[in-house]
Amino acid sequence: MINFSYMRAHDVADAVRQIAADPTAKFIAGGTNLIDLMKENVACPSRLIDITHLPLDKVEKISDGGLRIGALVPNSDLAYHPEIAARYPLLGSAILAGASPQLRNMASTGGNLLQRTRCFYFYDTTTPCNKREPGSGCSAIGGINRMHAILGTSEQCIATHPSDMCVALAALDARVLVTGQGGERTIAFSDFHRLPGDAPQTDSTLRPDEIITAIELPSKGFAGNYTYLKIRDRLSYAFALVSVAVGLEIADGAIKEARLALGGVAHKPWRDRDVEAQLAGAPPTAETFRRAADTLLRDARGFGHNDFKIELARRGIVRALTQAARGTPQSQADKRIA
C-alpha cells in the first residue's frame, strides 16, 4: 500500500469538487473492497475522500410508488428493512446470499455497485491483466478460468462481476441516481455496468467526477413469485459460479410478466429481455423454462476450465424459474448467521 492523504467531504457538492480536482482520488465508505485493492497495490489512490458523513443513509418511498435507497445504506440494514422484506424480498434474499455478516454491516449500497472483479489475475500484479494494466493481455484466457465468464466476453477480458445484490437490482429494473459537475442524472441499471469490449478497465458508465447518491426501485417488486438462487462451491462467503434472480407475475395459468438476471457469468449482471418476452404469455412449465434457458445461453462460450458453467447455468435457470413459479424461493436463512 502506498502513502495517501485523507479528507472528509462535507456534502455531495464538496465530494464532487474534491474528486474532480484529483483524478487519482477515490471515495471511501465501507471500504470492504477498496482497502483490499489498496493492500495489493491494485488500487493506488493519492487521496481518500471519506463520504460516510453525507446524508445518503435513508430508505424512502417515492411518488411513483417505488423506493429510494440512499447510497450509504449498509447492506445489512437494507436486507432487513421492512419495506424490502414486504415488497422486494428478491433484493433482500440476494444481499443475504453474499459476503458475511461482518462485511454486510460495513458495505454500502452504492459501493456494492462499484466493487471490482474477484479475478485472481486482476489481484496478482505479477501477471498480465488488461483490466488492471490495459494492453498487457488477459492471463485468464488460456489460464485458470474456472470462475470466469461465459457470456459477453471479449478477447481482452473474461472476468465476471462479483455482486449478488446487483443481480437482483438488474432483475428489478432499478435506476441509479448520480451527481457530478454536470448536475444530477439517472442511469437505468441495465446501462450502468459495461461489458469488457476493448476497454475492460472501465467497469461502469459512471463518469470520473460523479458520485452515486441513491438507487431507486420501481413499484413492482414481484414479492409473490421470486427467487435468488446462488450456486457456489461452499455455503458461506463464496462468490457465485452461477446465480439466478427471478421475478414472475402469474395469472390465469400463464406468465404475465417475467424478470430474469444472471450473476457469475458475465462482466455485468446479465439480463436478456428477449428471454423475458419469450416467457410472457407462456405456461409456467418445465418445457417453457428449458426453452428459456436454451435461448438465454445461445451465445454462451466456455474457455476450458469453465466449460461446465454453461450446463450449470442452464440447470440453474430452470430450477430458479421453477422455484419462483411455485412460490418457494431459495432460503437464505443460513446466511443470517453464517
Where are each of the predicted segments found?
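C-terminal structural segment of proteins
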Residues: 1-338
